[in-house]
């Protein structure tokens, strides 16, 4: 099998709104702590970043959910904070706190001193992990590469970690907008290089996680988040190995800006559970694919409830192509693995009725 041949291209077809035989599915954080086998490899690695920095181990955990479930894509096991870590901010993961940076970005001078790490140098370990994943997949399903959005990365760099209010980050936007624009531009160009490196290493689809875009007001969202995701898109290759490389933008809490997001020229728009699939399809479904949007907490319900919610999501989107089933955010560590199986089985059983029975999912 050649490196470009795929046994299952269902998700790539769905992102292009082409006919498929059933609704494709993958899950945000599908390789993670809810799986016992992941926890074993994580312990072997010694630390979270140790796991990310080992191409062999990263590829192993990337493959784990595909060994359990009939998924239509793999997503690289890594973290959105690899870029700020490579900028020298000193990333640590503290139990009960999450990511914490030793050095915060506090001033305009701090912004101007930040280096721009290269995909082929400081971040080479991520590219090696992508290549290792492609080799392990051997054409089974496509590999998704990803990054955080400039605004989301900036919040961690400015706050020094997670935040409930983003007060320091927003203060920069309000008080020093020129410095904020310099930071976003530096991050956008670094992200573009990072994603280009992932594509060169073998990623077949891309996703930009704008996790904290929904914390912004409409003016600042368009100016400091969306504009820089657009800047990234303009620097990305959109085809490789004879195939479209679909790019999905996901702004958590971004339902009010769907038209603006679709205007960027992305291929897919990620939805959280606060946005109706039916409403999103009515507004932008003629231009982009839609990804989502089961509430991750639903996977703590019993299998009958999960099946009912899968059916509701399918009914909301309706008949025809252009839907990639996913959660509305990352799967939670306490999720029972058997409930994931119940969700996927329900989707496989129920979704073919919404598609053309003559559609194919193999490489054409």
Curated annotation (Swiss-Prot):
The keyword Electron transport does not apply. GO terms for cellular component: cytosol. The record marks 79 as: Transition state stabilizer. One of its GO terms (biological process) is protoporphyrinogen IX biosynthetic process from glutamate. Substrate binds at residues 29-33, 79, 156, 211, 329. It is an enzyme of class 4 (lyase). It is found in: Cytoplasm. GO terms for molecular function: uroporphyrinogen decarboxylase activity. Its EC number is 4.1.1.37. Pfam families: URO-D (PF01208). Catalyzes the decarboxylation of four acetate groups of uroporphyrinogen-III to yield coproporphyrinogen-III. Belongs to the uroporphyrinogen decarboxylase family. Homodimer. PANTHER family: METHYLTETRAHYDROFOLATE:HOMOCYSTEINE METHYLTRANSFERASE RELATED, UROPORPHYRINOGEN DECARBOXYLASE. This is Uroporphyrinogen decarboxylase.
